Each structure stands twice: as C-alpha cells, then as structure tokens.
Amino acid sequence: MGPAIVRIGRGPSTRYGLAAPIGDLGHAWPLYLIDPRGAPREIGVLHSLAGPAWWLEMAPGAAWQSLTATDFPDAIFPGLPWFLDDLRPQGFLGRSFARRHAARLGVDSDPTNWSERAVAESLLKFGGDLPGAFVVGAESLAAALQPTEESIPADLRPEVYPRLATEALAGGLPRSSAGGEQPKFTAIVAKSDGPESVIVKFSPPLETPEGRRWADLLAAEAIAAEILRTAGFATAPTEWIDAGGRRFLEVARFDRTRNGGRTPFVSLLTHDAAFFGEMNTPWSDAAERLRSKGWLEAMDADRLVALWRFGRLIANTDMHYGNAALLLNDRPPLRLAPLYDMLPMAYRPGLENTIPALSEEMLARAQSAASPERNLALSFWQAVTESRHVSDSFRSIAEAHEKSLRQRP
C-alpha cells in the first residue's frame, strides 16, 4: 500500500500532498495549546508531508492567524512549523533531555545531530513539559496533564538545590528542556502565594576563581532585573541563594502560571528566522522590523530598543536573539516577553576559566553613549558597587564603569 493522500484546503484552492509517517506514530497528530488555567485546547491537526513539509489543519474556530500570517497563508511550512522550533532540545537542559531519551529514539545523544524527524518524534513521545504552551499529540498531552512534580518548600531550597545541581551536572534530571548554556535546572517552589515554576542557574564551586566570578554575575543579573523592573520594564522575578558552596539564581518562568497553566511564546531568534532571516543584527534593528510589519506595537518595540541600549552599557555582550522572546497572541501584534539573561557577560570566565579584567572597550562604549538608558546603567553599576554579595575584584570593575558613566559630559 502506498502513502496516504492528504487533502489540503477546500474548494478551488484544494491541494494534495503525500503523507510522511514518522515511525509507527502515524502522520497526523492533534496540536494542543494549554491555557493559563491549565486547560488544553485542540487548535488543529499537524500533518507530516513528503517533501518534507508540514501542514497545520486549523480546527474550526481556532483562528490563530499569528501562526500562519502572510508568509504561510496556506499553513504549509517547509520544515517543522516555526512556532514549534523552540521546542527542539537545545542548551544545557536540552542536552540533558537528549541524553535521557536518545536510546529510546534510536538517535545520537547530541541533539545538534538530530534530524527533523527525530525532533518531531521526541515532541510526540516526550513533549509533555517543554517550553511554552504547545503540546503535540495525545501521548505528550497525557504527560502534560499528569500531576506536577512535588513542590520544594521554600525554606528547604538551601538543602535541595545543591543536590539538584549535582544531578543536573551528571545529566540525571528528567526535567524541562530550555535553552541556554549556563548550568541550570528547573523546579517548582512552594511560595507563600502558591507554587512557582522556576529555572535555577548555579555557579561552579565558590572556592574557585571561576565560581566566584559566576557568583558575581548571577548577583549582577538579579540587580539588573530589579533596576529594570523598578523603571517599568517587565522582567522575570529573581532571587539568589548561597548554599552548598555555590550560588543559585532562581528565575520565575514566564511560560508557567501559579495554577498549572502555560503561556505560549517564541524566542526572537525563532520568529526572525521564520519571517525576516536577519538574526545577526542588533535587537534595535529587530525592533524596527517588528514594528514596521505590525508584529509589535510601538511601545514594545521601543522597550526592546531600550533594553538593547541598557545591555550595551552594562557590558552585556551576549544579546543574541535567543535571549529575547515574544508572547504569542492569536493574531498580531504580539507582546514583548519579560526580560531574562541580562548581565555583564563581557566579564564571564573564558574557555580556559580565565577571569577577565576590566575591559577598556566596554568603558569606551559607555563613554560614547548618549541614550536615555544611561541613568539606568549608572544605577546598575552603583548597585553592584554597593552590594555585599560581589567580590572585591568585581566591585572594582563596577566602580570603574560607574565612574566612566558619571564622567561623561
């Protein structure tokens, strides 16, 4: 028996494609969106086609125009649909996810070597707790609706987090896949106002030079988030804890709600790759593209520009498109997601764990800045200078940056 024929569309625009089954999982699966209350809604059926290509057959009444927009009016995608691309295993947690499931998928343990079909199979079999709110297939939905892991009492974090860090470094945590290379794990913490889903970054041992520097940077990340939050920017709430000889930075997840719900989002990287293909340009350029094409309202576009300017003034050399995100609506405009990963990455330890000294290049950047975010950056460096939680060497760096910003005419 040959491959099944898939009818695409209706009326004069009807087209036909060949189904492309994935293993014994078939070629069509429901696509669910879990809402902020934790209730799933089927928004369509995802078809795997020969080519390869993918077709999203929208459910009646599920008018998610933002998923197809002008570039994909027939909801046919040349690869895995762009709004699912952030579900690929990536970063520190993604590699851990891949190591756990590679044998059952029959693929290499390095997810960068996975084919698109392997990625799709992982979404269908193990996609119950991935970033965002989309879930593909009934098997992963059943996993998504299982009772969540037991919450960690807030007062027990100093005891539990060091153990989870050890397990994460060993690749033994069966938790959510999220991007980024900084060692981390995910958890649910029982806070006074309810359970909170968090991503927890952690430093190497504080007794090492690289551990001390990463501890400085994690403190700086929390300070930057607070400075920006006070100025009216949406940032993910943070809290740091020193325990077990490490520093832990707890960052609230904006894609999870307190009552077990989820919020759909895509990284700026994924969105730009799908609609513009200019991912190597600054955030400020992305903001203008998003504004001009109606993907962001002017206020959010201006905020993205402001965050980019602020990042340059605090020596953040890692503002790639994976470090900004957009909250999905059923139709444009989208919304800028709360900020995360804003810290002075110019001062992170090098590949050989060398510890960077004061960067004259970063100081010169501050000297030439005329942006309104200069005062925010000044507040940031002043707060770092005054913090009791940074090392003397990093305090000296902060003092130099503060002085440089104050001296600018």
Positions of predicted regions on the chain:
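Phosphate/dinucleotide-binding and metal-coordinating scaffold of catalytic cores
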Residues: 2-409
